[in-house]
């Protein structure tokens, strides 16, 4: 009888140990799956606003900064003002920019500006991102699409010189993106449209579908892949665009 009880106890202990091990394995598996989707550190994808380094689109409003009071000069506080165009540096184009009665920048939904985004690397030799070029990349299941182009490779968002030969989104690619229902499109120079285009068709196609365009992203240190994206433009009532802070963090899968 004692032997039977001893065997029974050992069997119960063994079952308990195996059960605890299985629970631990399941917990570890859940943690591993969770950690596999944990984003890494934040990357600042915002170009610094500085008259010495910020490119201004040809014909757009110049940028100026002025200190009204300066503690370095003996004042009791430091106080400044600045003047710049709505499309300076990293900024967001709202539908109102090219769509009559389109939403102004203060009415662009946060759901469009925050969420998963895919960064696509466009070869340095490519200036026109047309439908054929777009379809060379895996973009169709992306909620938001951002293009890293020659502008990042050449550091153009840190140069005050305006470069006309920046890479742009061709209208046929814009149509594909709009038809696919992407929530946001981003580029790494101060316009998504070809310089000197006879008509702003890329803007009209995207903004006409309510898709905000983020222009002037600083992507020099950003690699192709999937990211969490947060873009927060200034909440300016009734205007067509505004400078924004943009941050990203890589999704590790």
Language model feature labels by segment:
Residues 11-21:
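Bacterial N-terminal signal peptides
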Residues 24-253:
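Active-/binding-site microenvironments in catalytic and ligand-binding cores
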Residues 2-12:
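Bacterial N-terminal signal peptides that target proteins for export
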């Amino acid at each position: 009888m004692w032997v039977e009880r001893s065997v029974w106890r050992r069997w119960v202990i063994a079952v308990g140990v195996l059960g605890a091990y299985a629970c631990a394995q399941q917990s570890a598996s859940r943690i591993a799956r969770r950690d596999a989707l944990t984003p890494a550190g934040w990357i600042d994808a915002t170009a610094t606003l500085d008259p010495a380094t910020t490119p201004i689109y040809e014909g757009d409003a110049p940028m100026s900064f002025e200190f009204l009071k300066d503690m370095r000069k003996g004042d009791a506080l430091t106080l400044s003002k600045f003047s710049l165009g709505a499309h300076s540096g990293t900024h967001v184009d709202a539908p109102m920019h090219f769509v009559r009665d389109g939403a102004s920048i203060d009415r662009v939904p946060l759901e469009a500006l925050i969420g998963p985004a895919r960064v696509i690397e466009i070869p340095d030799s490519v200036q026109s991102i047309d439908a054929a070029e777009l379809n060379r990349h895996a973009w169709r299941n992306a909620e938001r699409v951002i293009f890293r182009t020659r502008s990042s490779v050449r550091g153009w968002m840190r140069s005050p010189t305006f470069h006309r030969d920046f890479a742009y989104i061709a209208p046929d690619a814009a149509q594909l993106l709009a038809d696919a229902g992407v929530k946001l499109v981003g580029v790494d120079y101060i316009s998504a449209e070809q310089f000197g285009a006879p008509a702003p068709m890329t803007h009209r196609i995207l903004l006409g579908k309510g898709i905000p365009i983020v222009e002037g992203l600083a992507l020099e240190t950003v690699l192709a892949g999937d990211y969490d994206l947060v873009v927060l433009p200034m909440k300016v009532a009734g205007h067509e665009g505004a400078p924004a802070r943009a941050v990203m963090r890589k999704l590790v899968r």
